[in-house]
């Protein structure tokens, strides 16, 4: 019988994802902290934090798992036209802090708001370790969309996105897929499957299959310049 594990502030190993609860789906552990080493240990094992403000830290590994193969995003003709018409600019790791802060702001008041100040500080620390990264969308000098996530070997674990203009977050996803494909990434972890992700081309993998792919790709290094702060051009 699966049971919930309780973590202390020592950097102990996580329990295996196979022991996660089925209800709620994927809840594996509670407690601990968001120290960069613990966070990286979590992603390395296919586990991520997700909890509401004023709640204890909750650690998840749902079954099934939503994933993309880089390049598999369904980009509609209307989105392609929109990107070309608006002449947006794109960048990598030029404004990570602003991206995560915008993600937090645009979620305020929504059910499931989880990008707390504690979460923001934790992922900003990961960014300093060159493990958390962002894609930015600009209209002139104004940041109008973006996303962020964590890179583990050839796997990119998406966390959240935002838009201040219509389609800007989808444009960020399209840029992410192109960037990951060009740097030989093999898998994008989109965490929890939903109809929106399915409409964009995400597939639902059994957790065991996802973990096997993660183990296959997580120790393979990518080019050192993949996440240097840079302007990038989208190809449609």
UniProtKB/Swiss-Prot annotation:
InterPro entries: Acyl_CoA_acyltransferase, Leu/Phe-tRNA_Trfase, Leu/Phe-tRNA_Trfase_C, Leu/Phe-tRNA_Trfase_N. One of its GO terms (cellular component) is cytoplasm. Gene3D superfamilies: Leucyl/phenylalanyl-tRNA-protein transferase, C-terminal domain, Leucyl/phenylalanyl-tRNA-protein transferase, N-terminal domain. The keyword Cytoplasm applies. Keywords: Acyltransferase, Cytoplasm, Transferase. NCBIfam families: aat. This is Leucyl/phenylalanyl-tRNA--protein transferase. It comes from Shewanella loihica (strain ATCC BAA-1088 / PV-4). The lineage of its organism: Bacteria, Pseudomonadati, Pseudomonadota, Gammaproteobacteria, Alteromonadales.
């Amino acid at each position: 019988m699966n049971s919930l594990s309780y973590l202390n502030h020592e950097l102990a190993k996580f329990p295996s994802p196979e022991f996660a609860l089925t209800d709620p789906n994927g809840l594996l552990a509670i407690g601990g902290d968001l120290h960069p080493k613990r966070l990286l240990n979590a992603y390395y094992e296919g586990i991520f934090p997700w909890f509401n403000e004023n709640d204890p830290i909750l650690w998840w590994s749902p079954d099934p798992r939503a994933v993309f193969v880089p390049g598999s995003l369904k980009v509609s003709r209307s989105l392609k036209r929109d990107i070309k018409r608006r002449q947006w600019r794109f960048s990598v790791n030029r404004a990570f802090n602003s991206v995560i802060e915008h993600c937090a702001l645009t979620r305020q008041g929504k059910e499931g708001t989880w990008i707390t100040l504690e979460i923001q500080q934790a992922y900003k620390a990961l960014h300093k370790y060159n493990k958390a990264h962002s894609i930015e969308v600009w209209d002139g000098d104004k940041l109008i969309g973006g996303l962020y996530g964590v890179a583990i070997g050839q796997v990119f674990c998406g966390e959240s996105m935002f838009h201040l203009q219509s389609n800007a977050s989808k444009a960020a996803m399209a840029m992410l897929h192109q960037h990951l494909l060009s740097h030989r990434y093999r898998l994008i972890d989109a965490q929890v499957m939903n109809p929106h992700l399915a409409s964009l081309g995400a597939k639902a993998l059994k957790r065991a299959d996802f973990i096997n792919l993660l183990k296959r790709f997580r120790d393979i290094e990518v080019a050192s310049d993949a996440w240097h702060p840079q302007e990038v051009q989208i190809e449609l």
